[in-house]
Amino acid sequence: FMPKNLVIVESPAKAKTIEKFLGKDFKVLSSYGHIRDLKKKEFSIDVEKNFEPDYEIPEDKKALVKTLKAEAKDADTVWLASDEDREGEAIAWHLYEVLKLEPEHTKRIVFHEITKTAILKAIEQPRNIDINLVNAQQARRILDRIVGFELSPVLWKKVKPALSAGRVQSVAVRLIVEREREIHAFQSEASYKVTAVFLVPDTDGKLVEMKAELAHRLKTKAEAQKLLESCQSAIFTIEDITTRPVKKSPAAPFTTSTLQQEAARKLGFTVAQTMMVAQRLYESGRITYMRTDSVNLSELAINGSKEAIANMMGDKYVHPRHFSTKTKGAQEAHEAIRPTYMENAQIEGSAQEKKLYDLIWKRTIASQMADAELEKTTATISISNTSEAFSATGEVVKFDGFLRVYRESYDDDVEQEDETHLLPPLKKGQKLEYQNITATERFTQHPPRYTEASLVRKLEELGIGRPSTYAPTISTVQQREYVEKGDKTGEERSYNVITLKKDKITDATRTEITGAEKAKLLPTDTGTVVTDFLTQYFPSIMDYNFTASVEKQFDEIAEGDTKWTTIMKTFYKTFHPSVESTLAAKNAHKTGERILGDDPVSGKPVSVKIGRFGPVVQIGSAEDEEKPRFSPLKKGQSIETITLEEAMELFKLPRTLGEHEGKTVTVNAGRFGPYIYYSGTYTSLPKGVDPMEIELEEALELIKEKAEAEAKKHLKKFDEEPELEIMNGRYGPYIAYKGSNYKIPKDIVPEDLNLDACMEIIKLQSEKAASASAKPKRGKYTKKKA
């Protein structure tokens, strides 16, 4: 019996879920992502022939394609059920082309959730492949290939070898570089915040503390001093009390970018992690499609939420809402990210899946709940001998509404009001006793560095990238080492506190740690130099508006309003000549080079620049008779800010620590960090050990530890077969033989093996591998290309 229908999706997990909903007439197979792409090592685009792409089937997909071809041949109908965005449409088109499918036997189906209802409905309403969506994806892929392929050699020649440039990535790095420069240029300004604590009788006559604050900051210490002196003899009176109702409305359901931001703030997930977990939830039928910029909910979801809220919390919490999408070209998927079944408040799954699902469920439910109703009371307190006034605010929740389920988190650059409490009962004209009044020196903060989440928000705000590109962009800039995620240690600073208590004024200086930041995106020196170089020679590539306008053009292609080749021609006409002229230009200085001054000993110039393996300090120049001396920068140092003194410190290496068994022990710095050299062996210094401070004893201890670890790796050798060795690796014991590794079965003690037993294991595993490669291999699931 042959199933009449073949359904092809892009991932095995998705195939497994869909298979449950379709009868025995359907067979569901996976393409494991793209089955065809531009050639890896070649340009693969024929510019003369209207930018015709030259696609190839990667080696690891050939067996899979063969299987799919055979299965498609035997089926009456082939259903292409890849995801419903441009990327999915392109996968469907490549399958159609490569498998040589016939139009009358091929149907394209789309759905944005994997539920029985959605799948059966999709099968009732098939459509043709939308070539406009395919062209939009193809245009992005080809434009990105042109930029990457033509710009990278320019960087190899002008900055350093092995660099690569990407269209959206380069702009993302520019944002991070510019933010770092804003921070370095930032001048902090001081002002004084004045707060008072008053003692007020509560309903039972007991005195309670009530906090109040001066409505504005005072500019100088003298002004603060003067105000506190006035308060010494002042009478404090409640001049006015206002009470007004305040409503808070819930946030819209999640889009890709808001989910990435909230998961980072609430769960500490990286953007890539969020997408990986969300993909698993989508493919197992728990949530709708996770690449979307729409906040729309289906009627079904709104009704499902309504029932769930009424059952759990009662009718007064229900408030159905329709949200509309602001993003231009929100075409990727036509619904927000929400649970497939609103009645499921919890799911089975891994800890991460449960956490992310819980977040999505709460956000969706909250979006369909009533406003929170609060009452805000503000009391104005006059000071008898000055025109200044204090203000005390209190808030009371009359009805919690959606807050019962969900509160939105904020980034550290959004000012948050302190938690406010209920005010004690107050009357107009009431006189107040103060307990203390404090003027504290505060400072303006530099703009915060980006987190992954706030960078996504910025990219979306600027219209750069799309739901499918945020995560890959953020991963790529870190993989290429243009940006690193790191913590900034704070610095100590002192500040003034002037206090009035019991009519006495005291003046104190205190210290605090300021500016500490965790898991922020910091530009590397390479990232900074590449950004400056590209901004100078390729201003349009680095321009935010230009990058956003390219995204809009992709949207126009997807709508069928523009031909994709027209956009390619326009872009290439200006881009290609600037590549040619930049390559030909002669530069007097190396890109990013900074002269720090002269070496006090030799009088030669000292400069910093990007060397082959990263940032270096150089003494002397290539024209000198003597070869220049080089030293890599230490972690935390930057070519933008390093001083001559700090640079000279680096040349104190190599340091001789002493002798051991007649051989010298030295410490030095290399491209991978500081190391100890002794008797032909190199031992890396662990993090936190300073090469300028390490002593001989500690160095010998590290050498010994390394030797012991090495010895543990080598379990057994045989004289009669010197190429064979039993080793201990990170995944357990194995046999190393002629450049290949063979796993030792768990039930065998590796030290007990003799040579014959080893050869038997090798023979068995080689035969097994040979028979496995003869079968059609399951292709790897390659991640979607941005």
Please state what every model-predicted region is:
Residues 2-142, 150-151, 215, 225, ...:
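Intrinsically disordered, low-complexity regulatory segments
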Residues 236-261, 330-343, 433-437:
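Residues forming anionic-ligand binding surfaces in small-molecule and nucleic-acid pockets
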Residues 114-198, 243-247:
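C-terminal or mid-to-C-terminal helical accessory/interaction module adjacent to the motor/catalytic core
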Residues 260-262, 266-273:
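A conserved hydrophobic secondary-structure block that centers on an alpha-helix together
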Residues 3-6, 17, 26, 152, ...:
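Basic, low-complexity terminal or inter-domain segments flanking catalytic cores
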Residues 238-242, 249-263, 288-292, 446-458, ...:
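Short acidic, hydrophobic short linear motifs in intrinsically disordered regions
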